[in-house]
Amino acid sequence: MDITTTEIYHDGHHTPHGWRRWLFSTNHKDIGIMYIIFAVFAGIVGGLFSLLFRLELAMPGGTFLNHDFQLYNVLITAHAVIMVFFMIMPALFGGFGNYFVPLLIGAPDMAFPRLNNISFWLLVPAFLLLMGSAFVDGGPGTGWTLYPPLSNLSGHPGAAVDMAIFSLHLTGLSSILGSINLIVTIFNMRAPGMGLFKMPLFVWSILVTAFLIILAMPVLGGAITMLLTDRNFGTTFFKPDGGGDPVLFQHLFWFFGHPEVYIVILPGFGIVSQVISTFSRKPIFGYQGMIGAMVIIGFVGFIVWAHHMFTVGLSYNALIYFTAGTMIIAVPTGIKIFSWIATMWGGSITFPTPMLFSIGFIILFTIGGVTGIILSNSALDRVLHDTYYVVAHFHYTMSLGALFTAFAGFYYWFGKISGKQYPDILGKIHFWITFIGVNLTFFPQHFLGLAGMPRRIPDYPEAFAGWNMVSSIGAGISMFAALYFVFIVFYTLKYGKDCPNNPWGEGADTLEWTLTSPPPFHTFETPPHIEG
C-alpha cells in the first residue's frame, strides 16, 4: 500500500487532536458529543425566543415588542422549528442515538462513519439558514406549520419563507441519512449472541424512530418543495385560483407532523426504560410488550394525522375515524406507562437525578396524554382547537415529556461520556427548579384555553391577564433552570470527581457500563460475546 493509505490506515488507531478531530470526525462518540453540544446551544437560543414572546404576553397591550407583531410571529416560528429540529431531535436521536447505540449493541462504530459526519454537519447550515431568514424581508411569520396562503407569496413576499424551506430540507436530509445509518448499524453490527430481542429498549426505540423518520420526512420534503414552486415557479398546488387546495398542504404537512411528535418522544421512552430499570434494580417489566407498544405507536401514528385538522371541514365519517384512531394510541402508551410503574413496583429504588427526571416525565407525560384524549374528541376540539389548551397539551408531552427524558439521559450517561461525575445535589436542584418552572409556565395555559384564548396572538383582552402573568413568570424560572444546567455541565467538567466504569451499581447491566469512563476512542474492536 502506498504512503497515503498507510498514513490513513494508522491514523484511525490513535485519538486525533485539535480541530481536525471534530471537523473531520467519523467517530460515533465524537459525533454524538457534537450533536449534544449543538442541541444544548440551539435549545438555549430557542428558549430565549420563547422568553421574549412570554415577556410580550406577560401583560396585555403588546408593548414589549413595540407592536411589531410580525416579529412576534417570527419568534413563534423560530422557537418551534429550533426546539423540534435543532434541539430535541439532535439531542435524543442524533446525540444519544449515535453515542450509545453502537456501545449498547457491542459494535465498533456506526455502519457508515462518513455518512455520520455529514448527517451532523448538515445541521449547521440548516440552523444558519433559519436564523438568517429572520433578518430577510421581515422573517417567516408563518408558524412552524407553514400553512398557505400565509406562507404563499400573497402572505409572505420576499425570500424569508424560501430560506426556512431550505433549512427544513437540510435538517430533513440530515435526519434521513442518520436514520439509514442507525438502521443498518442495528441490523448488521450487533455483537455475537445479541438477537433483536436481547437489545436494550433504548436501541429498539431508536430503531423504530429511524423507520418513522425515513417514512415521514420525505413527505415533508415534498410538501415544502410544492410550496417552494408555488412561491417561485408559478405552480398552483395550494392556490385555489389555479385549481389547487391549501387544505392539501395541511394533509401533507400533518402526515409528516404527527409521526414527528412520536419521532421526538420515542427515544425518550427508550431512555426512561433504561433509567427506571437501572434504579429499580430490576429488569424492565414486559420487555416484549414494551417493544410491541413502540411499534404500534409508530404504526398508528401514521394514520391519525387529520386530528390536527378537525376544524377545516372534514366529512363526518373522517371525524369519527380520526377521533377513534387517536384515542386508540392511548392504549400502547398506557402499556408503557404501566410497565414503567410495574418495573418500579417491588424494586429496590434509589432516587438520583436521572430517576427524578424519569418519574417527573411519567407524571407530566400522563397529564399531557389525558389532555390529548380530550382533544382527540372532534366535537370538543371544535372549541379547543387553536387555543392555549392545545399549547398546554403538546408542551406537556414535548417540553415536559421529551425534554425531561433528554435530561434523564444526560444525567444518566454524562459520567460515561465525560469521565466526570456531577454532584448529585446540583442535578436534583436543577430538577426541582425545572419542574416548578415548566409547570408554572404550562399548567395555567389549560385554564386560558378553556376560557377561549387563541394561540399565536401577540395581544389579548384583560380578562386573560392573570394566568398569562403566572405563565410568563414560569418561563423566566425555566430559562434560569436551563442556564443553571449549563453551569452544572461546566462545573462538572472542571471540578467533577472521576466517574467509575459503573457509577450506578448492580442495576446498570447494559454493555456501556463494562467500558471505562470515558470509553476509549475505539471500542469493541474485538466484539463482546453476549450470553444468556
Swiss-Prot record:
Q: Where in the cell is it found?
A: Cell membrane
EC number(s) per entry: 7.1.1.9
Q: Name one Pfam family in it.
A: COX1
Binding site residues for Fe(II)-heme a = 79, 395
Which CDD domains does the entry link to?
Cyt_c_Oxidase_I (cd01663)
| Matches recorded under InterPro entries | Cyt_c_oxase-like_su1_dom, Cyt_c_oxase-like_su1_sf, Cyt_C_Oxase_1, Cyt_c_Oxase_su1_BS, Cyt_c_oxase_su1_dom, Cyt_c_oxidase_su1_bac
Reactions accelerated catalytically: 4 Fe(II)-[cytochrome c] + O2 + 8 H(+)(in) = 4 Fe(III)-[cytochrome c] + 2 H2O + 4 H(+)(out)
| Main localization of the protein described in the UniProt heading | membrane
Keywords, in A-Z order: Cell membrane, Copper, Electron transport, Heme, Iron, Membrane, Metal-binding, Respiratory chain, Translocase, Transmembrane, Transmembrane helix, Transport
Q: In which pathway does it act?
A: Energy metabolism; oxidative phosphorylation
Select a single GO molecular function from the record's annotations and give it.
metal ion binding
Catalytic class of the enzyme? translocase
Q: Which of this chain's residues are annotated to bind Cu cation?
A: 258, 262, 307-308
The membrane topology term of the UniProt record is:
Multi-pass membrane protein
Q: Which residues cross the membrane?
A: 33-53, 74-94, 95-115, 118-138, 163-183, 200-220, 252-272, 284-304, 318-338, 355-375, 394-414, 431-451, 473-493
Record-level GO BP terms: electron transport coupled proton transport; oxidative phosphorylation; respiratory electron transport chain
SUPFAM superfamilies noted in UniProt? Cytochrome c oxidase subunit I-like (SSF81442)
- Superkingdom classification of source: Bacteria
Amino acids binding heme a3: 393
Q: Which GO terms describe its cellular component?
A: plasma membrane; respiratory chain complex IV
Q: What does this protein do?
A: Cytochrome c oxidase is the component of the respiratory chain that catalyzes the reduction of oxygen to water. Subunits 1-3 form the functional core of the enzyme complex. CO I is the catalytic subunit of the enzyme. Electrons originating in cytochrome c are transferred via the copper A center of subunit 2 and heme A of subunit 1 to the bimetallic center formed by heme A3 and copper B.
- Which family does the record assign? Belongs to the heme-copper respiratory oxidase family.
Q: What is this protein called?
A: Probable cytochrome c oxidase subunit 1
Q: Which organism is it from?
A: Rickettsia conorii (strain ATCC VR-613 / Malish 7)
